[in-house]
């Protein structure tokens, strides 16, 4: 997607995947009065090692000054996430999440996330690359599951998603099934739109209860 936006001449993506801080974007939520869910850094990671703490501080300042919005922040860099909030409080309107794509790298991130006192803590199991096995969802409020998209997408077995759904139901976490991605439930390759987002004949659209007064999401 970044390459496509670069070819289209979109200013923010002229450098492709090269890290590019855009402090001017931080004013947009202040101008928007209607309650909105923002997915922060949807194509990057706010806790990337090259993003200075000072910039993250600016992001958190904007978040605190716009309590009408909700902000989803997802990271694979759980160590830096923990270190950052070890000396700072988490804004009440922030949802903190970690990527949990597999057992080796993803599942261990859950333990650190659980220690951070965010109002909403969530897992993004997308792309789900294998059966995650037993999960401890204590302190986890929301779990997103989805398959991989793109030319090199790997298939997701339906049983992997079902296992997570069952554990969410048993442990009181809200379950959201986002998409099949490039491979359908039947194991056939097709467009993600054609594959849809039904699991066992229905959509699973669980969301944390705090979203009842917000609009559809916006990436930032």
Question: Predicted segments — roles?
Answer:
Residues 39, 72, 95-97, 122, ...:
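A structural signal for isolated positions on well-ordered beta-strands in alpha/beta enzyme cores
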Residues 1-94, 103-106, 132-140:
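Conserved Radical SAM active-site core
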Residues 85, 89-141, 155-162:
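Short loop-to-alpha-helix "cap/lid" segments that border enzyme active sites
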Residues 43-45, 76-78, 99-103, 126-128, ...:
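Active-site beta-loop-alpha junctions enriched in small/polar residues
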Residues 40, 73, 113, 126, ...:
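Conserved, mostly hydrophobic/aromatic
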Residues 118, 129, 134-220:
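Auxiliary Fe-S-binding modules of radical SAM enzymes
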Residues 32, 65-66, 115-116, 170-171:
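Alpha-helix C-cap/termination motif
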Residues 54, 58-61, 83, 111-115, ...:
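Alpha-helical scaffolding segments of alpha/beta enzyme cores, especially the outer helices
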């Amino acid at each position: 997607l970044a390459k496509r936006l670069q070819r289209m001449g979109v200013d923010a993506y002229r450098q492709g995947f090269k890290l590019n801080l855009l402090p001017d974007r931080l004013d947009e939520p202040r101008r928007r009065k209607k309650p909105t869910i923002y997915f922060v850094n949807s194509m990057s990671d706010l806790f990337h090692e090259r993003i200075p703490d000072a910039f993250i501080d600016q992001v958190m300042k904007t978040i605190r000054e716009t309590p009408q919005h909700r902000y989803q922040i997802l990271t694979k860099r759980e160590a830096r996430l923990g270190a950052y909030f070890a000396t700072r409080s988490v804004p009440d309107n922030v949802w903190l999440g970690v990527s949990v794509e597999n057992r080796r790298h993803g599942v261990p991130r859950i333990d650190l996330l659980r220690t951070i006192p965010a109002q909403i803590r969530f897992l993004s199991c997308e792309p789900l690359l294998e059966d995650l096995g037993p999960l401890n969802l204590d302190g986890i409020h929301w779990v997103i599951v989805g398959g991989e998209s793109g030319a090199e997408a790997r298939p997701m077995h339906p049983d992997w998603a079902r296992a997570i759904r069952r554990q969410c139901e048993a442990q009181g976490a809200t379950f959201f099934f986002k998409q099949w991605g490039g491979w359908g439930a039947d194991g056939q390759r097709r467009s993600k739109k054609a594959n849809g987002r039904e699991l066992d004949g229905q959509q699973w659209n669980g969301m944390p209860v705090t979203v009842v007064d917000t609009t559809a999401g916006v990436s930032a």
